[in-house]
Each structure stands twice: as structure tokens, then as C-alpha cells.
């Protein structure tokens, strides 16, 4: 039945491309989460009126975040070709996409983390400070737990954005469903391959959104 309607789709290639897309997304998402949380915390903590208020440090971090967040992903890949070749030894394949994916998504998530932390009730923070809580205690016992639903929503949005970025990376040689859709579909004039690859990308996005919403609803006690 499948071969009848999609004669040009190689199932082995499809599953391999799906695996490569998931691999690129999950690995880069892990690094983006860690780096994004650190940058987001620093942006919040060094902002005016916060625990580590420091205008100079905040301005530098904000500038770095804004610069890399603003560069279109395709251009970012091109700019990082030399760095990517040095880091992973190649500019082709799933691993070659990881540096650009991480550098492109971490600043994006950092801003979402900062926004999530700003939504935490200042009264709760002040109460913790008045009780003599250390900064580390406030961060790990107050800020992060209180902002967790927003942090999960943010990482869900970041993951979905990464799926789109992997498709762009795939179109220029990084593998995945984007590469399958472009090379085996568009360039080979196989509309069915492009269609199936697109459907698989949509399915992955829907699954990520459902999981993200489910986790957010479970931990959101408001």
C-alpha cells in the first residue's frame, strides 16, 4: 500500500533520516538547555535590582545573546564552517550541524529563561533573602522551581525551532529529513519523497509539543 502511493520513498533512507533529525535535535537541545539556563540566569541575576546587579557584565552577556540570536541560521552555518571543520573534522553529516545548532539555539533559549525568571514573584525572592538564604539556595530552591513550567514551555519552543533548523542544515549536507526532502525529493523531482519527509517533520513537531504541554501541565501547580 505504501509503495503504491509513495513509489520513490526508500523506507530505510526515511528511517535513517528520521534518526539523524532526532539525533541532531536532541544533542543540540541538551547543550542549548545547559548553556541557555546558565546565560539566562546570568542575564537575570546581573540585571538592575537583582541579586548580582552588574551593568557591565549584563551588557556584555546581553550583547552576545542578541548577536547570535539575530543571525539567520543559514548564514550562521556558513560563518561557522571553519570552526565546525576544526571541531568535528568535517562540514558534512549530522555532527557537523551540531555547533551551529547549539550556538543558534542557546541564546534563543537564554532569553526565554530570563523571561521565565522575571515572572517569579519578587515577594517570594525577598522572603527567602530575609530568611538569610544564600544566593545558591535562592537560585535552586526558589527561582528554578518557581519558573519550571515556563522553562519547560521554553525548551519545547526551542526544540520545535531546532527541528526547523535541522531541516535547513540538512538541505546543505548535514543529513536528516531536510536533506532527504531536498536531495531525494526536490532535486530528484520526487514530490512524494518531499511530502513524506514533511509529514514526518510535522509528526515530530506535534509529538514534542504534546510532550512539552503534558510535562508543563503536570508541574504547573498554579
Swiss-Prot record:
Residue intervals of the ABC transmembrane type-1 domain: 18-212
InterPro entries (alphabetical): AA_ABC_Transporter_Permease, MetI-like, MetI-like_sf
Localisation: Cell membrane
GO biological process, one term: D-methionine transmembrane transport
Major place of residence: membrane
Record function comment: Part of the ABC transporter complex MetNPQ involved in methionine import. Responsible for the translocation of the substrate across the membrane. It has also been shown to be involved in methionine sulfoxide transport.
Family: Belongs to the binding-protein-dependent transport system permease family. CysTW subfamily.
Protein name per Swiss-Prot or TrEMBL: Methionine import system permease protein MetP
Organism for this UniProt entry: Bacillus subtilis (strain 168)
Amino acid at each position: 500500500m505504501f509503495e503504491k502511493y509513495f513509489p520513490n520513498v526508500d523506507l530505510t533512507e526515511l528511517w535513517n533520516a528520521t534518526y539523524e533529525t532526532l539525533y541532531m535535535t536532541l544533542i543540540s537541545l541538551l547543550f542549548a538547555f545547559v548553556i541557555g539556563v546558565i546565560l539566562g540566569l546570568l542575564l537575570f541575576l546581573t540585571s538592575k535590582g537583582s541579586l548580582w546587579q552588574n551593568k557591565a557584565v549584563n551588557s556584555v552577556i546581553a550583547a552576545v545573546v542578541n548577536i547570535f540570536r539575530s543571525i539567520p541560521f543559514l548564514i550562521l552555518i556558513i560563518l561557522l564552517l571553519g570552526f565546525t571543520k576544526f571541531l568535528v573534522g568535517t562540514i558534512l553529516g549530522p555532527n557537523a550541524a551540531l555547533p551551529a545548532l547549539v550556538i543558534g539555539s542557546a541564546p534563543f533559549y537564554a532569553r526565554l529563561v530570563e523571561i521565565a525568571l522575571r515572572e517569579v514573584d519578587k515577594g517570594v525572592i525577598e522572603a527567602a533573602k530575609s530568611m538569610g538564604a544564600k544566593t545558591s539556595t535562592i537560585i535552586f530552591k526558589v527561582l528554578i522551581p518557581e519558573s519550571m513550567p515556563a522553562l519547560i514551555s521554553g525548551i519545547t519552543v526551542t526544540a520545535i525551532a531546532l527541528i526547523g533548523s535541522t531541516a535547513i542544515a540538512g538541505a546543505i549536507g548535514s543529513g536528516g529529513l531536510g536533506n532527504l526532502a531536498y536531495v531525494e525529493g526536490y532535486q530528484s523531482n520526487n514530490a512524494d519523497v518531499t511530502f513524506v519527509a514533511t509529514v514526518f517533520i510535522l509528526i515530530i513537531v506535534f509529538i514534542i509539543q504534546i510532550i512539552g504541554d503534558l510535562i508543563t501541565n503536570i508541574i504547573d501547580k498554579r
